[in-house]
Amino acid sequence: MNDHYYTAEPTSAHDIRTIRVSALGVEAAFRTDAGVFSRDDLDVGTRVLLESLPELRGRLLDLGCGWGPVGTLLGMRYPDLTIVMSDVNSRAVELAGRNARANGVSVQAIQSDAFENIEGMFDTILTNPPIRAGKAVIYGMFLNTKAHLTQGGKLYIVIRKQQGAPSALKMLKEHYESAEIIEREKGFWVICAEA
């Protein structure tokens, strides 16, 4: 059986490799492995998300962190951020924590199915949601996210237009104070929803 990147305990054979990623004016080396999302490089959607963000402050949650490029690169760019990275995938969480530390970034890396093991409030939550898990799963994540945002806190998501960005925007507008598209690039929409 093949593992999905949102499998909690991947059983696929390890295939560890090192890649270099440049974004936000910083460059970092990352270890990746089989059984995690986009193990060969920073995926286009995540790059679009990263490059569309305003300057960030406070406490940040990288929800569905994978091998940790978002939290690590943001931590390198904004060293005063308090960063929590989470993923349902145990292999991804281990890689994310190691990658952050190897690049001099202090983070808390937590294995969690959405918010199951996440405590506290966040000023910013970022996610490239697991589209293949289905609309019910990702909309549930979006709804639960609001309860973990400070007043005025922001959720940033990246989603392909053809994979449901218009309906996700509509849903977010119905449940958040505001929601808007802040970037459209290469078929991806970056949506910011404010609690």
Language model features with spans:
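A short glycine-rich, Lys/Arg-flanked "PGG" loop and its adjoining helix->strand segment in the class I
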Residues: 139-151
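Conserved beta-strand signature within the Rossmann-like core of class I S-adenosyl-L-methionine
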Residues: 152-160
